[in-house]
Amino acid sequence: MSILPARTIPFTKASACGNDFLIVEGGAVSGDLAEMSRRLCDRHNGVGADGVEWLFPDDEADIAARLFNADGSEAEISGNGTRCVAAVLGSQKESAEMLIRTGAGLKTCRLTGRRGATFEFEADMGDPILPGELAIEMPGVGAVGTQVSMGNPHFVVFVDVFPDGWQRQGMLIATQPAFPQGTNVEYVSVIGPKEIEIRLFERGVGETRSSGTGSCASAVAAIVGRRVSSPVKVVAPGGVQTVRWDGHVYLQGPATLICRGEFFV
C-alpha cells in the first residue's frame, strides 16, 4: 500500500542569476493559485522559490505564463521568470525563438547559446514607460527616484554607496500610498560609462539576488539621466545581465534548469 499522498504537482525549478522560480503546468492545480504559490515558494515547508510561473496553453504564443510572487500576489511579469519559462520550453523542443504571453503582453525570447542546462537568451522587453521623477518623504526615509514601468512598476534610486538598511528603506518605499499597487525598488550605483551595480527589493518577495525587469528599469533610468550609454552591463549579487535600449529594451542573460520534482498536496 502506498503511503504517499494521492495528489502531486510536478514542477521544474529554474534560476536566472539567482532569482529562482518554479515552473508548473496550470492544469495541475484546481484550487487557488495564490495559496498554492505561497505553499510552493515556502523555503522551509515547500520547495522554495521567489515565485511560480503557472503555464497555460495559448492560441498565439508558445505558452502563456501567470506569475505569482512568494507571498501569493500576482505580478504582471518577471524578466528572469520569463527566461526561466523559455529555458523549460528550450529543453523540450529545438527552437531559436520562444513567444511567451505574460501579464504585460507577448514577449519574444531569442536563444543565443546553451551550455548543458544553462540557456542564454535575449528577450524583447518592449517599450519602457517613464512617468518621471518622484520624491518620497517619510519618517526615517527620504529618496528621490525615477519611476519606470517595464510592464510592472519600478522606482529607481541612484546612490554613490548602497546605504545601510536599504532593504528596510526599500520595503517602506514599496508600500507607499504613492504606489497603489506597490512597486519594485532598485538602488543603483554607476560604476562606469556602460556599467551599473544594483540592489533590489521586489514587491511581493523582498530582497532578491537579481531581477530582469529591475535590470531593465535601472539601465533605462541611468540612460535617460545621461549617467551611462547603451548597452549597459548590470551587475547584481546573483550575476550579470546586459540591457540594450534600441527602440525596444532588450535583456540578455542566462537561465539555468535546476531540478524537476513533485510536490505532495
Regions found by a protein language model. Give the residues of each.
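Internal active-site segments that recognize and position negatively charged phosphoryl groups
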Residues: 136-164
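Short glycine-rich anion-binding loops that position phosphate/pyrophosphate groups of nucleotides
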Residues: 70, 128, 153
